[in-house]
Amino acid sequence: FVQHSRKENFYQGILLGILSYKSDWIVRSNRESGEGFSDITIRISNSGTGIVIEVKYAEAGHEEEMVQKALRQIQDKDYGYEFRQEGIRRILYYGIACNKKVCRAEVLEV
């Protein structure tokens, strides 16, 4: 895993395991796109949909702040670039922040 804390890697690993179960989803981790490396990207076969997920560890009570930070990072670093280059028209950005058993997520469709 690229440049992440061990806590972020833990949550990212769990998500990768869950998301990789779908046979028609192409799931990749730490893929270079735009100005950096996105945590998780998913291309849903034959649907024209791409998903970019950024995972953050949050201190207790700071989950919303970290969700917004994750979404800003996706946009600022243009992690959807690769999908647009491939002609994918529907791209979903997920910011996810976790602290122990508490996770908060928000999605933007671009």
For the regions a protein language model found, what residue spans apply to each?
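Structural signature of nuclease core domains in nucleic-acid processing machines
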Residues: 1-110
